[in-house]
Amino acid sequence: MKKIMFAIITILIINKGFSQAKIANQTTLDSISKIVIHYLQAKQADSLYALAGEHFKSQLTEENFKSIANNQVFPLNDFQQITFISTENSVNSYKVDGTPELKLLISLDGKNKLETFLIQPFNN
């Protein structure tokens, strides 16, 4: 009986630990997402790129990122009205109101740097 109680208590403690880690990861993602949104609103491409992880940076140079941000992304929308939609598979989704309506997707890598930073047309 003592072994069963010990096993149950151990499982509960481990489960609580995983829960707290998941909450901490979500809190970090939410915090960095707020910073990303701030930099979008301020049109600070260099600051956005500084938040990027190694994989992200290996796909896009800083100069190319700045060019895309300044010539395509920033003129597209003012990013002033952004609403959280959901989190799925550690990716936060946001609706960006305006013309056109956009969807913003943000995720982090293992070092809490941007892994996914995607802006696409919003579809219901």
Each language-model region and where it sits:
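Bacterial Sec-dependent N-terminal signal peptides
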Residues: 1-22
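Generic structural motif
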Residues: 4, 15, 99, 109-111, ...
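Short solvent-exposed beta->alpha transition segments
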Residues: 40, 45-86
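Short, solvent-exposed aromatic-acidic interface loops
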Residues: 118-124
